[in-house]
Amino acid sequence: MSNQDTRVVVGMSGGVDSSVTAYLLKEQGYDVIGIFMKNWDDTDENGVCTATEDYNDVIAVCNQIGIPYYAVNFEQEYWDKVFTYFLDEYKKGRTPNPDVMCNKEIKFKAFLDHAMKLGADYVATGHYAQVRRDADGNVEMLRGVDNNKDQTYFLNQLTHEQLSKVMFPLGGMEKSEVRRIAAEQDLATAKKKDSTGICFIGERNFKEFLSNYLPAQSGDMRTLNGKKMGTHSGLMYYTIGQRHGLGIGGDGDPWFVVGKNLEDNVLYVEQGFHHDALYSDYLIASDVSLVNDIDLTDGLECTAKFRYRQKDTKVTVTRIDENQIRVDFDQPVRAITPGQAVVLYDGDVCLGGATIDDVYKEAGQLTYIV
């Protein structure tokens, strides 16, 4: 099939990455349509969320490069699949990753389904990742060339079927090159800053935002030996390994969050970056999603990331059952956080990932969440 007979629907956010994605595909002769996804109702947020402004930028870019554009509303799907998950995880004392869930449920599910109804052969986004295909229809996901921007961590839940319909035109490029192309073409978004933070929070204070949806309950801040060190303002506001915002004075090493007790509403803290309570030897994770089937019965040696932009750690992965894996680390790892993603790699190939449930030392489960 020639490029001009291949319809690619581009998810456009109003940012520079998706703008250049659409431009490159148009230049390559594809039949390109731009779609702006409205995932969050910004009418009651005092204008902080910039959906209207972003859509105007999408319109400007699409008019510049000469492609049709539409806006589609996924607010209900987003609320049901991403935001309620986000709140439920915080209620459990965990630290969720809404970007992973947004990619899984919205950008590569609701949006993909919508694009197929428009006759799309592929969808494309401005993510920094790569898709490798062969003649037999096999698909692999690879890290983006720009190490600093690689987004495979957030795409770890994509299935083989989803990836077979996806293009990532920026995956082989550095961010600086993307900016250069945008400037050369004088795209409306060329000088726009990269967005930061979770889409539905924007630049607002996270603590303030969360308290609108979940009631906070203050409680004791204690060492693992039970010594009271202060008062916390609500367990959901703290994450494992957190240093700032504890309000513990005095001399010596800084203090860090090492655990939570939901039943007694206690936040555990200990002193020192390398405190033993922050280190673990293995984890159990669920919601396992692998791009391609891998036999994990005898253990797979590969590498893993436990948070975005972290260096890879050598691990051995064993399947417990259909939905759970055990990941053993070659060396103890610091501040692994339940609710976050563990993402598996074989060299530059992203194998898939899972959601961290429990973290252990060889001697037994840590006190991260009791």
UniProtKB/Swiss-Prot annotation:
Belongs to the MnmA/TRMU family. GO terms for cellular component: cytoplasm. ATP binds at residues 11-18, 37, 126. Gene3D superfamilies: Adenine nucleotide alpha hydrolases-like domains, HUPs, Translation factors. The record marks 127, 340 as: Interaction with tRNA. Residues 97-99 are annotated as: Interaction with target base in tRNA. The keyword Repeat does not apply. Residues 149-151, 307-308 are annotated as: Interaction with tRNA. Catalyzes the 2-thiolation of uridine at the wobble position (U34) of tRNA, leading to the formation of s(2)U34. Its EC number is 2.8.1.13. The gene is mnmA. One of its GO terms (molecular function) is ATP binding. This is tRNA-specific 2-thiouridylase MnmA. It comes from Staphylococcus carnosus (strain TM300). The lineage of its organism: Bacteria, Bacillati, Bacillota, Bacilli, Bacillales. It comes from the Bacteria. Keywords: ATP-binding, Cytoplasm, Disulfide bond, Nucleotide-binding, RNA-binding, Transferase, tRNA processing, tRNA-binding. It catalyses: S-sulfanyl-L-cysteinyl-[protein] + uridine(34) in tRNA + AH2 + ATP = 2-thiouridine(34) in tRNA + L-cysteinyl-[protein] + A + AMP + diphosphate + H(+).
